[in-house]
Structure formats: C-alpha cells, structure tokens
Amino acid sequence: MKISELDIPGVFKATSRIDGDHRGTFREWFKASSFFELTNTNFIPTQANLSFSSKNTLRGIHYSLATDGQSKWVTCVSGSLLDLVIDLRVGSPTFGNHVFVTLESNSGDSIYIPKGFGHAFLALEDHTCITYLLSSEYEPTLEYEISPLDSSLKINWPNVDFIMSDKDLNAPSLESQKVSNLLPKFRD
C-alpha cells in the first residue's frame, strides 16, 4: 500500500496493488496495521456499507457528530466517482477547505476521511458502487448533512443535472449548521 497525504492534513489517498491473472484480480484494499505504520493513524472499522448509484447521482455532504467521531475509508468497487472531502471542524485552520479525488474501480485507490470531516460524491457512471468502512456505527440521531450546492463552499462540481435525495437537496448551509452548533469541533 502506498499512502499520500492530500492538501488537507489528515486526509489520505491510499493506493493498493491489484494482482491479476487469467482468473481475474485480487486486491488487499485495507489493512489496519499497514495504515497505522504509514500514517500513525489508528483506524479500526466497526461497520461496512455499500452504496450503489446511477450516473450523476450526488450524495452528501454527510457527517457524524458521534461521541468519538467517525472516520471513513472509501473505495470505489464498480464504476467511477468524484469524491469530495471537506473540513467541517470549527476552529480548524483548514475549516471549509475541500479536496476532490476521482476514484475508479480499477485504480486501487481509497480515501481516508478523518473524524470531523464531511463527505460527498458524484457518480460518474451508471452502476457505480462504493464501500465505506466506518470507525463508529451509524446512529441516525447523530448524522447530519450540509448542502453540496451551498455557494459559500465554492465547490466546483461538474455542470450536470444532479440526481439527489430530497434530504440532500434541502440540506442546510454550512453557516446554518455552524450557527446551530451542529458542526464538529477542532481538537489539537
């Protein structure tokens, strides 16, 4: 596994080797000990999810206010997507900053999203499937969203007709969530 830190400290892109022969391919896409060794970040998954999306589906921006926070390991296993990670930690020097990463099923790439960050993605193909490994279990009462179309975030999504859930389409702005004290806090 090769790891590179992206433009926001603590956000990592991991590339794993894909081995193949006449039978198909094999990929070890996450190993906690290797990730810790390369990043000094302890990530132990407690839940795994799959998400299937049609082309132009925009999901997010989602985040958790779980007591211990929630980090994610995101991997595309079919199709391709434009993945967005945004720092939502009030008081962080990178608050509101975001990075985009294109994930493709045949790339061997995954993204690590630390606690206190939001996540969204745009499916670039039909039959796009991503996996999420989560550091804490899903708890609906602690899950929140911010509009991925909030103009104050200056997110340059591709110019397409998005397919969105009503929940994401009507999600509040970053400023609204901040004023409501519904954002994670930065901890040194």
Regions inferred by a protein language model and the residue ranges of each:
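Non-catalytic, conserved peripheral segments adjacent to functional cores
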Residues: 1-106, 126-127, 137-188
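Conserved metal-binding segment of the jelly-roll/cupin
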Residues: 103-125
